[in-house]
Amino acid sequence: MNTSPDRVIIFDTTLRDGEQSPGAALNVDEKLTIARALARLGVDVIEAGFPHASPGDFEAVQKIAGSVGSEADSPIICGLARATQKDIKSAADALRPAAKPRIHTFLATSDIHLQYKLKKTRQEVLEIVPEMVAYAKSFLNDVEFSPEDAGRSDPEFLYQVLERAIAAGATTVNIPDTVGYTTPSEFGALIRGIKENVPNIDQAIISVHGHDDLGLAVANFLEAVKNGARQLECTINGIGERAGNASLEELVMALHVRRSYFNPFLGRPAESTEPLTKINTKEIYRTSRLVSNLTGMIVQPNKAIVGANAFAHESGIHQDGVLKHKLTYEIMDAESIGLTNNQIVLGKLSGRNAFRSRLQELGFELSETELNNAFIQFKEMADRKKEITDRDLEAIVNDEIDTVPDHFRLELVQVSCGNNARPTATVTIRTPDGSELSDAAIGTGPVDALCKAIDRVVQIPNELISFSVREVTEGIDALGEVTIRLRYAGRTYSARAADTDIIVASARAYVSALNRLHVALQQKEKTPEMLQV
């Protein structure tokens, strides 16, 4: 095994660490959809979940291993496991269908974690790590070990732990900045120290994992690459615990745009034009939108690479410069991440073949049933909107691949409001038993009245904690996208919907979020979680 390749391995943990963002809970089908997108994107490793955490996570990892990871050229499918036999056995079982499976096991090494969380001594950790790595190795050849909170661990102790993990069979050692505490110079020095002081480090790939609590995760990772790290653990849109993880799109495009700078650190001539990762950058924007839609986590407009303003210029001086030559104020081409202004316009006279053809050109792969349903939505939208653009098509497709079970189905929405009127809303909803129930309510505004009317029918307790609207397209008949976040029993549930009518989009998003909550309540009754992580 080449433990110092001349390229960077991209390890995506959107489906594991990214899903730990409040409100980002995904069902099995949604995880499968994202895993397929990650494979298209070209990631080397997909960390599909934490199999022992819950039956749902086990099923998701197993299904991803059997579908996305079943071929010889598929990405490596990875499952997380604590350094216990039960966790490791669950991961091995879930990963069995994968052609290239990996177990990722971890144990904390910082004194604060040892004292307050694990209540173990350093000597105990030095004994547990090789034992559990060897146990994982008894199932699979590919084993990754992480010393949790390495960024705050004593370096000398860390060197000992890593040496024992590698001796026991770890093929990758991952160095996590678990709480986003280190600075780039410190993190680079930590990686350099590991390269210089772990005797058998040449037998494993050095990986890094980091959180963005101080906004330094990407900078830390790039410094780590310069000092010998060859695997980067990251997420789409940087989602994850607290302030999130290092952002995949920012890391990949930094390595892409500044290739001549990073080439020598990977043993290449500065002028080499070979990509530093296997990522198909033209899939970045579409993957970002998919993850945002399915998790309900909005990408901030000024987010690097994939934000709505990333390639926008408002200053007259900047606009003039860009019109004369793009490189005056743009360091990368929007088309390099799959964002194009080449908007093919469809209308109400466009047929199924034109619709199918444009979806294929945009890279969407739909089943015949999904295509039929999406075409019906397209025709309905075309009757209300003069022109249908690529952004509209994207919204239609994302609605169709939103796999939340339709237990409660919105059949009718009517709202009355005005400057001298009490906002009222009437709704009709089909319930899980097939009956149609109608009710009405008044509120402080049309959306408030709408949510109250829906609550009277559905009767699922919740707290609406976030409501946002953004335009998908331009013009007076623009498609509007509503994102709603609910909270119940300490957990957050998100959903989104798009429509030319914001009230209709609001109703659909709210019902979709309630469906997510309803499914979660049903699953909790049937199969309580195996452990709390």
Swiss-Prot record:
Main EC class of this protein?
A: transferase
Q: Which cofactors go with this protein?
A: Mn(2+)
Q: What is its EC number?
A: 2.3.3.13
BP GO annotations: L-leucine biosynthetic process
Pfam families the UniProt entry points to: HCS_D2, HMGL-like, LeuA_dimer
Q: In which pathway does it act?
A: Amino-acid biosynthesis; L-leucine biosynthesis; L-leucine from 3-methyl-2-oxobutanoate: step 1/4
Classify the source by domain of life: Bacteria
Q: Name one GO molecular function term.
A: manganese ion binding
Gene Ontology cellular-component terms listed? cytoplasm
Q: Does the keyword Membrane apply?
A: no
Q: Which family is annotated?
A: Belongs to the alpha-IPM synthase/homocitrate synthase family. LeuA type 1 subfamily.
Query: How is the quaternary structure described?
Result: Homodimer.
The protein here is known as 2-isopropylmalate synthase
Which organism does this sequence originate in? Microcystis aeruginosa
Q: Which gene encodes it?
A: leuA
